[in-house]
Amino acid sequence: MKEKLKRHGLKLTPQRLELVKILTERGRHHPSFNEICRAIKSKHPNISHSTILNNLKEMTKLSLISSFNYKGETRYEVNPELHVNLVEPNGTIRDIKNEEILKHLREIVKLLNEKERSIKSLVILAE
């Protein structure tokens, strides 16, 4: 991720490097904005929430990370591949990589792109 940041002209400041480290270590666990803030502020207490948010937005815009909203909280992840985020009854979010499900998901994405133009993300709520 550091190389991608450099390629896009972003400086590798200590705070940004800490954010990259946190996302790399915790990104597959879909941390919330508040969880990321607590983690980065433990090492860089003077960093502002807006700096963290602006960096997360920039990384999302560059497709280095992705974000989604769950129960009013923005969650972040580093998995760029097509996948399903499964929310467990206890609130844990995990990636599903079942090939049969992914096959159907690719078909749905293809149909949506054909009928609804291009899509960036797809959220399905099934409770």
Functional labels for PLM-detected ranges:
Residues S32-H44:
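DNA-recognition alpha helix
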